[in-house]
Amino acid sequence: MGRRRRFTQQSTSDDDDDKAAAEPPKTAKPAVPSSSGAKKQPRRHADEEEDEDEEDELELEDEEDDEKDLEEMRRNEEEERREETRTRRRRGRKPKRAVEESDEEPEEKKAESDEEEEEEVREEDSTEAVPVGDPVKVTGKGKKQRKHYASFEYEGNTFELEDPVLLTPEQKNEKPYVAIIKDITEYDGSLSVTGQWFYRPEEADKKGGGNWTASDTRELFYSFHIDDVPAESVMHKCVVHFIPLNKKIPSRKEHPGFIVQKVYDTVAKKLWNLTDKDYEDNKQHEIDLLVKKTMDRIGELPDREPTDTPGDNTDQFPNKRGLRKRPMNPIDVSRDATGKSEHFVKPETPGSDNLKHYAILAKFKVLTTATYRDKWLDKLLDTIPLTSNEGAGAAHADPVSVAKISNNGSSALDTSSVDNENSYAPDVVVSIMASLEKSTYDSLGSDFQKYNQKMRKLEFNIKNSPVLRTRLMNKELDPPVLLTMSPAELKAGLTPAEKTSEPEESRRLQMTDARCERCTEKKVGISDIIHAGHGDRYQLECISCGHTWFSSRDAISSLTVDAPSTGGNVGTAPWATAKFDVLQKQLASPRDQPDNKPGTDALQKSTAPSMPKLEKQKSFTKPKPEEPSAPTLEKQISFTKSKLDEPFVPTTLIKQKSFPKPKSQEPSARSADHE
């Protein structure tokens, strides 16, 4: 029976069937002796039939058990395959080919396994980033060749240039990175993305240590840091709003997304305002473009009051100037109200906030919703005299001024005509000042301190510079031009182009015989004298090369005057020569000379020393009581006068020159006596 069970179980081969057919006669031999074989023949057949029935039942049971075992094995194999594919998908590895199944596996299950393999291949293909379209440019050659694309596709999503995206962080506990796609490159078969990074406040380091605290959970810091990452690290797109500091932040429900109001300097580790105008030209254009895109997407945002503007949390210094004091109402201390203008609005007027020209500003509809802007408009309007104010002042003039005007007559008419020329119509003044304030607010409105400083500077220069005020009112200067002018240019009332084109005024310099240290030319003059405690210092300037330096008084030996090219020679006139002599003596010993001496005194003083010297020489060389003849004395006087044109000579040298002359006359006198 054991052999027959084994035969029924292994019925898959034809050779086994042949062997099994030959085996039954061997096992069918009777075990009893031959003597009793004939009697028990029918009984044996009955027993064999019963045994065969039992064996058939057992074989059926065994076959059913075997089929159950096979089905269970197949289920286990399918579960193992599915688990393996799941783990491979999570790890991102390519799945292995399915193990070949036996011939007994049904065709339906084979088809299902083929479909699963195709899906796995599709999923594997979708995990790789693929560029879209042709490359926009190619850089490098050979192995270093790089292809640049405008977009790429990854996991069914398409990403383009300038798209803000989230990137996979390095650590699982970190938040996703945020960047703007600036370039898409393919190198050596792999696709990479160049991103310009954003920083979260808790990720940005301070210069002195630590991190910044976020004013909003959505806040990010913009930066100019650029780095390359694999294209597969891109998760999905996001929205970033660039909001100036003077605008209110939109609500999270209406406009979800990140908020950027600061720029993080990764090198200096400092923060800058988004709307500062101190960036480089290309970076400034980039920031302005991002702000413009935000405004086009979400619309115009309402202004934020300066007191609500968050202070700069940079580590540069504590911003004490940002704490503005509440302005106090001006107190009127005048005894009478006769000289007041009729346009001055009372403090109890609603909405005026003590503006002097509130009625004019309201009439021409230039008032803004911001109080501080209206105050600056009122101050600018107060710098220009208005024709209506002039008439009002004349109507409310006091009797004393009227009496003075009647007594002066024509002089009063002249002054009134000058005032009328300098006064302007209110509509002209209001339009110009409103344009000036608006241009200042558009450029510096995000920073209240810079706006306040610029308005104070403009108000001061317009009030104190008649040239600037006249040119501005005559529309020779546009209001936006005043924002680019320096304090010196505002004071002169000239633009940079006009100031450079203006010819320089010729200067008269006291020239010296010193030599320039740079060009070694003898064209050095004194441009300035600095009076110090121990001695005067002289600032010398070379006319040839423009080099300037400081020197002591000892370095100056002689002085001349550098006259303009159009004038004549200054040293030819006798009085000018006398003045130069005085200057020489003053420079030689400035403390010995009196302050105010006319030129005639200097001439007499220069000629006086020669006379007593001649008398001393006469008395010293006089052998007899005879005096020198008149012609000799006249020659000596003319000789000393002619020396005025020469440089200053010490007195000892004059004595030596005048000493030999009386000696030349002594032999002639003695010879006359002998004769």
From Swiss-Prot:
Keyword Aminoacyl-tRNA synthetase applies: no
SMART domains for this protein: BAH, TFS2M
InterPro entries reported for this sequence: BAH_dom, BAH_sf, TFIIS_cen_dom, TFIIS_cen_dom_sf
GO terms under cellular component: nucleus
GO terms, molecular function: chromatin binding; DNA-binding transcription repressor activity; histone H3K27me3 reader activity
Entry function: Component of a grass-specific mechanism of vernalization, a process by which prolonged cold exposure provides competence to flower in daylengths longer than 12 hours. Negative regulator of flowering required for vernalization establishment by repressing VRN1 before vernalization and in the fall season.
The protein, known as: Protein REPRESSOR OF VERNALIZATION 1
Gene that this sequence comes from: RVR1
